[in-house]
């Protein structure tokens, strides 16, 4: 809504995750925030969240990977923990995409919303955890889903705004075909790496 920023939603989710884990902000070693619609271009929303939580001097960084941002964050957090660098990490996925869409464009505005989710990841000697992740990217499709204006390629000007270049642009049919193919392949790849098949799973949550 009006006056609400990404860090506001992130803060709510982070506090709920910390409460559920029985932890305080001072117990955190790192904060990762996956977002493409942060409070500012810079500083990072992770830094804003760190300050608002009271997790002073904790490492805080944003990850910009759109819909796959949370999975990228999960993989980065897992690697940090496995390396021994950090033991307790807060990972937040948050976006406020209703502020980036052109509400007169019904092909895009109905697809995007606002929300946040948070998890706490900790080092454990045994038990359940993140088994594996498979990541990939294809920059050749960058122009199919983007916000053209506002970056160093097309700095924000009056003309950019008048042309609507500050709004989210999507070529839905092409993105759909591209995404479904990539998601299916990534699913098969991660199962193969883990020595599993689709029949071994009880739940699959696609996006």
Question: What are these model-predicted stretches?
Answer:
Residues 34, 64, 89-95, 113, ...:
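Short beta-strand segments
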Residues 1-3, 105-177, 181, 185-188:
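Condensing-enzyme catalytic core mediating Claisen C-C bond formation in acyl metabolism
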Residues 13-29, 185-202:
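Phosphate/pyrophosphate-binding loops at sites that engage ATP/ADP/AMP, CoA/4′-phosphopantetheine
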Residues 82-116:
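Flexible, glycine-rich active-site loops centered on histidine and acidic residues
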Residues 34-40, 201-207:
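Glycine-rich phosphate-binding loops at beta-strand->alpha-helix junctions
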Residues 53-55, 81-84, 109-113, 124, ...:
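Solvent-exposed alpha-helices and their adjacent loops that cap or buttress functional pockets
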Residues 17, 28-31, 49, 73, ...:
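Buried hydrophobic positions in well-ordered alpha/beta secondary-structure cores of metabolic enzymes
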Residues 1-8, 35-89:
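Conserved catalytic cysteine-centered active-site region
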């Amino acid at each position: 809504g009006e006056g609400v920023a990404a860090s506001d939603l992130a803060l709510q989710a982070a506090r709920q995750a910390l409460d559920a884990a029985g932890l305080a902000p001072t117990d955190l070693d790192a904060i990762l925030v996956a977002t493409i619609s942060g409070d500012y271009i810079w500083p990072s929303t992770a830094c804003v969240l760190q300050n608002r939580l009271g997790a002073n001097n904790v490492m805080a960084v944003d990850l910009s990977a759109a819909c796959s941002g949370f999975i990228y964050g999960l993989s980065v957090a897992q690697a940090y923990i496995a390396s021994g660098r950090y033991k307790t990490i807060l990972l937040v996925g948050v976006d406020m995409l209703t502020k980036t869409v052109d509400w007169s464009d019904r092909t895009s505005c109905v697809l995007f919303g606002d929300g946040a989710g948070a998890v706490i990841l900790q080092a454990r000697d045994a038990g359940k955890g993140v088994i594996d992740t498979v990541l990939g990217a294809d920059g050749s499709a960058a122009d199919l889903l983007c916000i053209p204006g506002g970056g160093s390629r097309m700095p924000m000007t009056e003309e950019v705004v008048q042309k609507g270049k500050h709004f989210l642009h999507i070529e839905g049919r092409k993105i759909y075909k591209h995404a479904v193919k990539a998601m299916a392949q990534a699913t098969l790849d991660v199962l193969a790496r883990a020595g599993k098949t689709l029949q071994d799973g009880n739940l699959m949550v696609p996006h």
